[in-house]
Amino acid sequence: MSIKVTQEKLPASRVGLQIEVSGEQSRQVYERTLTRLSREVRFPGFRPGKVPRPVLIQRLGETALKANAIEDLVQQSLESAIAQESIPAIGNYQLSSDFETLVAAFQPGESFSFEASVDVQPTATLAQYTGLTVEVAEVPFDANRVDNVLAEQQKQMATLVPVEGRNAAIGDVAVIDFQGILVESGEEIPGGSGTDFQIEVEEDRFIPGFISGIVGMAIEETRTVDATFPETYAQEEVAGKAAQFTITLKELKTRDLPELDDAFAQEASQYETIEELKTALTERFQAEHESEVKASKRDAILTALADQLDVEIPESLLQREISAMINETASRLSGQGMDVRKLFTEEVLERLRENSKDEAEQRLRRTIALGELAKVTETQVDDEAVKARAAELLSNYPRPQEIDRDRLNTVVREELLEDKLLEWFEANNSVTFVAPKAAETEVDAASATVETTATETAEEAPEAPKAKKGKKKA
């Protein structure tokens, strides 16, 4: 289809198109539309494809026929215009002309003009990619982590024995009955009651005031305890509100901890001695720390690159990235056993899309910045390197025949290219580690991610954590 096309550059990586179609082409499309509809519609007394044209026009109406023809003509004309002008289009087009006006003006056999716009691949430039100074927040290594993990494992493997001759203290395990009300209204708290409820008497295990109210109680004692739900509590109907709990202490237990010896190691893990277990934990935590350091450095470098990027991200690309983020979150939550169909209601999805815009844009800016760095530095990945890495990954997978090899090669190539680009950046810029700022360690409630926004709808009413049993393999 030969057509006349006038292009206009629009903001946000869009191109406006003024398209003119000849009278002969408008006639041909109209005729094809009538032929298609005559095959598709079903009228009593006529076989499919045998509906006479006058009957078709009378039954459907001239306006409806023109509207169908224009839809076909616009779609075909846009596809031809994009191909003819070599426009790097992404996403769907948007009709700028008023559709009803087009229908009223359309005459088969006469020239037809309309305006539309389409998103295109963004043009990006890096203002600077050498000589930059990048500060990376240090990731401290917790030297006590092995001891803390073993201590927690001791608790899980401990034997609970009844407490005699004293009142409840921090570190105990209590069995309680409790019932809560909101002070202001006197109404019962949804989910705020329980019978024979086992709770660890540990600070910060429940809402402020609850645990401190249990401390000092005697068995069979009943107390009224004042507590307050945090302002940031997941259930909005009780967040920030004062509550009263009537608590009866029915049983009190303490933990008889096992010794940290070889027998402990054999029961808690696949290792024969406690020293082997400690060594394995140390090596694992050191490897995790190295990964965290690498991730911190990657994040800082990509942020620095994105800050140097000049680009207008098209809306269709942004929405596509948001959809990808939501799908990733849905996949993770589904893997955790959550019913995402119930979780992702229409209201939740709308909120997710809105809350995800900033993160999606930053992800796109990082991806585009890396792509531009690869162009200007002419960095590529050797096919043999991709093949070797893919083979290594497949060797560690129990069912390699189930893996999509093309997809695997694509992912491997992207990862190897990113590694090479990050190495190049480090060699040509100043990348230094600095102590993390205090503000960076605080939780910013306003910056909710896709996953936190999604999962907060699944939060239940306050529930005290129960004492854990069983063993955990190291």
Swiss-Prot record:
Residues 444-456 have a biased composition (Low complexity). This is Trigger factor. The keyword Cytoplasm applies. It comes from Synechococcus elongatus (strain ATCC 33912 / PCC 7942 / FACHB-805) (Anacystis nidulans R2). Its EC number is 5.2.1.8. The lineage of its organism: Bacteria, Bacillati, Cyanobacteriota, Cyanophyceae, Synechococcales. GO terms for cellular component: cytoplasm. GO terms for molecular function: peptidyl-prolyl cis-trans isomerase activity; protein folding chaperone; ribosome binding. It comes from the Bacteria. GO terms for biological process: 'de novo' cotranslational protein folding; cell division; chaperone-mediated protein folding; protein transport; protein unfolding. Consists of 3 domains; the N-terminus binds the ribosome, the middle domain has PPIase activity, while the C-terminus has intrinsic chaperone activity on its own. Residues 171-258 form the PPIase FKBP-type domain. Belongs to the FKBP-type PPIase family. Tig subfamily.
